[in-house]
């Protein structure tokens, strides 16, 4: 899910509660199923599966859970089947929102998404109504404290050069993290180069990145947006 508001854009949060983590694991589990069914269970021959495994590890999913998910998806009797469905709409004050889902029931999911927009005083729109405001990019987040713990003296310049040499498009520094942006086709190569260098990744995913951001100052609009995002999560 991508938000047109700066604070609504998904960023690293050091502490995730158990319910949030459970939802993330469920989504990643479905992504594992789709990746295995599309390209097989061997990560060495399935770049999409490698990307999903990296995402799982960045979210602290246990290795045995990852392995079980791959084996289950590869089983001949596996009945799990998910489809990707994308919804677009507007939150309060015209904030553009894209919702990406993996579902085994599109009708149910469409109703749930529509309900989330409505309860947050927003509205679901037609396909393409906001997607032109976003660019699909590879997004990698690195926590400064974790980088120092794992890589010692590596500074921002060295990290930036490692990323750019591997094919990254952009590198930016926040207060407590670094963000690396890649073209979708270069994402796997950049991620693998960073992992090979021993750099810990907090987030590694293909995401819809807003071209511009809006700032919400109205308290009610902020509450409505939080309500929408909470329901969508």
Enumerate the predicted regions with their spans.
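N-terminal cationic and glycine-rich segments that engage phosphates or anionic surfaces
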Residues: 1-125, 129-143
């Amino acid at each position: 899910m991508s938000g047109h508001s700066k604070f609504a854009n998904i960023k690293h949060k050091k502490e995730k509660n158990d319910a949030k983590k459970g939802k993330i694991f469920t989504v990643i589990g479905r992504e594992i199923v789709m990746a295995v069914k599309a390209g097989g269970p061997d990560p060495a021959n399935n770049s999409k599966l490698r990307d999903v495994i990296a995402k799982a590890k960045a979210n602290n999913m246990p290795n045995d859970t990852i392995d079980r998910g791959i084996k289950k998806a590869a089983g001949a009797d596996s009945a799990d089947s998910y489809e990707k469905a994308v919804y677009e709409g507007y939150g309060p004050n015209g904030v553009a929102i894209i919702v990406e889902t993996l579902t085994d029931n599109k009708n149910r999911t469409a109703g749930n998404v529509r309900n989330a927009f409505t309860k947050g005083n927003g509205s679901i729109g037609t396909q393409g109504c906001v997607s032109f405001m976003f660019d699909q990019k590879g997004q990698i987040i690195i926590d400064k404290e974790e980088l120092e713990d794992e890589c010692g003296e590596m500074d921002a310049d060295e990290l930036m050069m490692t990323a750019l040499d591997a094919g990254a498009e952009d590198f930016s520094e926040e207060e407590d993290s670094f963000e690396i942006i890649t073209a979708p086709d270069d994402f796997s190569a950049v991620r693998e180069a960073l992992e090979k260098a021993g750099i810990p990744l907090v987030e590694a995913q293909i995401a819809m990145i807003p071209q511009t951001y809006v700032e919400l100052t109205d308290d009610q609009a902020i509450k409505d947006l939080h309500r929408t995002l909470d329901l969508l999560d």
